[in-house]
C-alpha cells in the first residue's frame, strides 16, 4: 500500500490505518470459518446416504449439526433445500469443502513466498512455482505437484493464520 496508497498531498497511508484495515478483515472469522466447515460437512453427509427415500430434511440437518457440534448461534450457511452447489450437478457434489481447501493452498503457498529471503517478489521462487505447479496443470496428481513446489504437504495452519484465528 505504501507504494500507491497516497492522499492528494502525496502522503503515504498511515501504518495505523493499514493495521485497522487488516484487523477489520479478520473480524468474525471464527463464525465464518465454522459456517463454511458446517456447510462442507453437511454436503458430505448428504452424499454418504445410499438413498434419499423417506429422509426428513430438517431432522437430517439437525442430526448433522449435533454430530459436528454446531452451536445454536451458528446455523448452516445454506439450508439443504436451496444449497444448489451440492445438488445442482455443478461439479461441487460432495466437494463444497473445495473452497476451504483452495484457501489452504493459497495461504500456504503465499507463506512460502513470505518466508523467502527475497520476500514475496522472489523471481526465482515465482519461476519455480510456475514450472513445478502452474504449468503442469492436470498432468499429475495435484498433491504431487504441490509437494514438488513446496517440498512438503500444505499446512492448514496457514489458512487459520490468514483468517486471524491463530498466530
Language-model regions, residue ranges each:
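Cation-handling catalytic/transport regions enriched in His/Asp/Glu
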Residues: 1-167
Amino acid at each position: 500500500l505504501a507504494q500507491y496508497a497516497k492522499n492528494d498531498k502525496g502522503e503515504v497511508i498511515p501504518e495505523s490505518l493499514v493495521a485497522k484495515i487488516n484487523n477489520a478483515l479478520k473480524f468474525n472469522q471464527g463464525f465464518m470459518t465454522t459456517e463454511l466447515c458446517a456447510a462442507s460437512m453437511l454436503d458430505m453427509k448428504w452424499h454418504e446416504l445410499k438413498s434419499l427415500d423417506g429422509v426428513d430434511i430438517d431432522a437430517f440437518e439437525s442430526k448433522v449439526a449435533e454430530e459436528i457440534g454446531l452451536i445454536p448461534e451458528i446455523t448452516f450457511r445454506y439450508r439443504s433445500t436451496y444449497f444448489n452447489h451440492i445438488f445442482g450437478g455443478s461439479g461441487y457434489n460432495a466437494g463444497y469443502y473445495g473452497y476451504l481447501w483452495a484457501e489452504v493452498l493459497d495461504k500456504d503457498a503465499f507463506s512460502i513466498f513470505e518466508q523467502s529471503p527475497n520476500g514475496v517478489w522472489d523471481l526465482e521462487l515465482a519461476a519455480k512455482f510456475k514450472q513445478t505447479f502452474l504449468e503442469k496443470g492436470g498432468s499429475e496428481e495435484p498433491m504431487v505437484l504441490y509437494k514438488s513446489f513446496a517440498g512438503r504437504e500444505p499446512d492448514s495452519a496457514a489458512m487459520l493464520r490468514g483468517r486471524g484465528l491463530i498466530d
